[in-house]
Amino acid sequence: IFLAGSTFGSIFRVTTWGESHGKALGVTIDGCPAGIALSEEDIQAELDRRKPGSNPYGTKRKESDSAMILSGVFEGKTTGTPISLMVRNTDQRSRDYGNIAYSYRPGHADYTFDAKYGFRDYRGGGRSSGRETIGRVAAGAIAAKILESLGISFCTYTKSVGPVSIKKFHPEEIAENAFYMPDAQAAQEASAYLEQCMKDHDSAGGVIECRINGVPAGLGTPVFEKLDAVLAQAVMS
């Protein structure tokens, strides 16, 4: 059966590719206008925020996640043709997953992949791994450059972790803590809460909020493809 569903967007089209324990992961972006200043450093800055091993509360896997632009950029500017980026995997330990080759993990996509395709890559979740988000983050970094040229800016942060919610909003504090919270006190409380969760072998949920400024009125349509529906499709996919 054909594996579809790896592309999102219509004007700005994003196609992610790769698996958690493959040689590399990446993304191809079609629809980026020509003349946008873009470098690997622009993308790397965002990838460094999501890379594993940089947060004590995330995965223990260590990856440099170094971005390599393969096409679509010349002399520091986009050419208007498809932009392809790649990040090599360097810390795969596939042997750690040998015991689940014939069993399914609760809460993962093991069973659904097997049921749909009759075959699955059990090493680290394969295509359903969180490392698939490398392509999304890289594409987001490029989209941010385009939006910046249009006067649109955004701020994303963690609003709550478990029962701990922010009470203040200081944007300058977002990058100063492991939770990207705009409230230093709330970040300390979230840290203590998660430390207890770890001791209890428990997990916790959270809420992320995004503020976008400079968006012109009238985006979206009144019936199908409403703006909130399109955003929901992106966020929930």
Question: What is each of the regions a protein language model found here?
Answer:
Residues 2-61:
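N-terminal, positively charged regions that mediate nucleic acid binding
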Residues 2-17, 119-121, 228-232, 237:
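Short, hydrophobic/aliphatic alpha-helical segments
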Residues 12-32, 131-146, 224-227, 236-237:
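Conserved phosphate/anionic-ligand binding catalytic regions in large, soluble enzymes, centered on
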Residues 12-18, 25-31, 83-85, 113, ...:
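Short beta-strand elements
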Residues 35-40, 94-96, 220:
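Short, conserved charged micro-motifs
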Residues 46-106:
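Glycine-rich, N-terminal phosphate-binding loop and its surrounding beta-alpha-beta segment
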Residues 90-125, 166-169:
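Flexible glycine-/small-residue-enriched beta->alpha junction loops
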Residues 115-223:
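Glycine-rich, mobile lid/loop segments that gate access to catalytic sites or pores
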